[in-house]
């Protein structure tokens, strides 16, 4: 038994030079088996993201033994982080960026990954641009702002479209339904099963009746509902509805063919081709394609520095500058 443990220990303590040799042989084999003119050529067909995913998804059962499993992990990690090319700081950047993307809400994860940020600083800048866009003239539906956007836009607009005389009966029916459903709850432990089943049937029939009443009101105002939906689609602000197939429809740019999952993102992208810059600075008349960029530009006139370092108190006008500054503190703290 001790002999086996000793052998395993020697395998686990293999040097990085041995692993590098394995990597070199593997890379040479890949390139020899690939046609240089083929689209599957090693240097162009495999990206660091591919190796990152393989590294994270690799399972012990995918290898014949512990030695092969460890060697494969070394190989995939090496191909992902590329220590022969990247500095220690760049490798840390990749690891931190991966974890940062992992903790984002799923909607934001998908959006950020489509834009392929190269580092954490670029990712933060992109997310802050989105946050500012939410407060600007164009409201964009986004992950954690979903409830805010729905609350801010939907109730007021729907109220304007539907007359109050039609909304009130629905409200009263819902209130009545709530009271009646409460009254159906059994308060006596000795109530027979037949009574419970009867109450359940009453709840079901009541729910069906209310659903039909609400559906009738919505159908009576079909043209107004279409107007409401069309307005938000034009502005690129149509909110995602669960189970709505139209939301999944992809938006394609006619100029370059790039695909977007949201019409709002397509509208912003099309300004690159059209050169449209609807946001102008009041001070110098310089125009910008996005309101978020205009907000950053205005700080050059006002001297506003909203981003403050908690370690030394130094303030910055842009988050990217604060991000670079914070790295210096981190490097000083790390021995």
Curated annotation (Swiss-Prot):
InterPro entries associated with the record: SCAN-C2H2_zinc_finger, SCAN_dom, SCAN_sf, Znf_C2H2_sf, Znf_C2H2_type
GO MF entry, a single one: DNA-binding transcription factor activity, RNA polymerase II-specific
SUPFAM superfamilies assigned: beta-beta-alpha zinc fingers, Retrovirus capsid dimerization domain-like
Transmembrane segments: none
Any Gene Ontology CC annotation: nucleus
Gene3D superfamilies: Classic Zinc Finger, DNA breaking-rejoining enzymes
BP GO annotations: negative regulation of DNA-templated transcription; regulation of transcription by RNA polymerase II
Zinc finger (C2H2-type): 251-273, 279-301, 307-329
Entry keywords, A to Z: Cytoplasm, DNA-binding, Metal-binding, Nucleus, Repeat, Repressor, Transcription, Transcription regulation, Zinc, Zinc-finger
Purpose: Isoform 1 and isoform 2 act as DNA-dependent transcriptional repressors.
Subunit and interaction comment: Isoforms 1 and 2 can both homo- and hetero-associate.
Family named by the database record: Belongs to the krueppel C2H2-type zinc-finger protein family.
Protein name as annotated: Zinc finger protein 396
Species of the source: Homo sapiens
Gene name as annotated: ZNF396
